[in-house]
């Protein structure tokens, strides 16, 4: 390959060569052909991209448009109905049902139906919401109210008295601040018992008592001596009252009813009629005088 041909090849490949400047027509036509081919390829690629985008958009719109329209229509209908059905029964019922359903579904507000254990009476009330302690808590409340739940159902069986209440009552009695006081009779009985025990232990019935016990014995003797005549007088009065009642019961009169008078009046019997009744044992009834006959007291 000669040097002249080599230089021509290099000049043709190099853009800023003097040979290219000398022949501008040939270089301009080559550039224009290259630019036109590039622009055509770019425009074809852009058009293909646009076509693909438009086709994808149209397909997505065709699938998504009816869904959006349905949603928008349903929302508009709901809003329109809520405006006019705010105070209607059906709307309020649906809301109340949903709320009640949620309320019953929530595990916080449900009471356990089974109670396997009852807590100790001195256990503090726990506010925790764990399962184990909640059972103890509800059963503790049931015991304090005097009721207890059994089995699966909600049947309530009342109890007479819980155990912890009885314990607290007995303790409160033992811890009472007021001292226990004996009456005079109890004291004298205890004194007599003490005398008998002392006589058995010492073997002699004659022994000296302290001054405080002597004063009590003297006061008891005077009370017995003063109460003696009063008791006798009261016994006499009771005997007189019993005698008077027996005499009145023996002198009772028979009552008869007549057709003329509706008011009961006592009959005054003669001595002959009384003697005849005693002899016969049963009184004679005059049917002519009274249609009902004679009433006999039983």
UniProtKB/Swiss-Prot annotation:
Residues with the modification Phosphoserine, per the entry, are 17, 118, 120, 282
Q: Name one GO biological process term.
A: spliceosomal complex assembly
Compositional bias (Polar residues) spans? 219-228, 247-271
Q: Where is the composition biased (Low complexity)?
A: 23-36
* Localization (cell): Nucleus
Task: Please indicate if the UniProt record lists Nucleus as a keyword.
Answer: yes
List, alphabetically, the InterPro entries matched. Answer: RSRP1
Record has Phosphoprotein as a keyword: yes
Q: Where is this region: Disordered?
A: 1-135, 161-181, 218-298
Q: How is it modified after translation?
A: Phosphorylated. Phosphorylation at Ser-118 and Ser-120 mediates the interaction with spliceosome proteins.
Q: What does this protein do?
A: Probably acts as a spliceosomal factor that contributes to spliceosome assembly and regulates the isoform switching of proteins such as PARP6.
**Protein family membership:** Belongs to the RSRP family.
- The name of this protein is Arginine/serine-rich protein 1
Organism encoding this protein: Mus musculus (Mouse)
């Amino acid at each position: 390959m000669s040097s002249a041909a080599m230089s021509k090849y290099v000049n043709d490949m190099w853009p800023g060569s003097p040979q290219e400047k000398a022949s501008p027509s040939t270089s301009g036509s080559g550039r224009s052909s290259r630019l036109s081919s590039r622009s055509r390829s770019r425009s074809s690629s852009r058009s293909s991209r646009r076509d693909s985008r438009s086709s994808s958009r149209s397909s997505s719109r065709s699938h998504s448009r009816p869904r959006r329209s349905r949603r928008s229509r349903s929302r508009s209908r709901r809003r329109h109905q809520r405006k006019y059905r705010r105070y209607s029964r059906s709307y309020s019922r649906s809301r109340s049902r949903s709320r009640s359903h949620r309320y019953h579904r929530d595990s916080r507000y449900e009471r356990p139906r089974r109670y396997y254990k009852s807590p100790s009476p001195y256990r503090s009330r726990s506010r925790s919401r764990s399962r184990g302690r909640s059972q103890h808590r509800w059963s503790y409340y049931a015991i304090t109210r005097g009721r207890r739940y059994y089995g699966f159902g909600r049947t309530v069986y009342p109890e007479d008295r819980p155990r912890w209440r009885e314990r607290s009552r007995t303790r409160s009695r033992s811890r009472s601040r007021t001292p226990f006081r004996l009456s005079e009779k109890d004291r004298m009985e205890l004194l007599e018992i003490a005398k008998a025990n002392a006589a058995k232990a010492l073997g002699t019935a004659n022994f000296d008592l302290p001054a405080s016990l002597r004063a009590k014995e003297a006061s008891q003797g005077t009370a017995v001596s003063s109460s003696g005549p009063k008791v006798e007088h009261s016994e006499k009065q009771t005997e007189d009252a019993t005698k008077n009642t027996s005499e009145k019961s023996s002198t009772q009169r028979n009552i008869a009813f007549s057709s003329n008078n509706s008011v009961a009046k006592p009959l005054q019997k003669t001595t002959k009629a009384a003697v005849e009744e005693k002899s016969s044992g049963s009184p004679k009834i005059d049917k002519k005088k009274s249609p009902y006959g004679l009433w006999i007291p039983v």
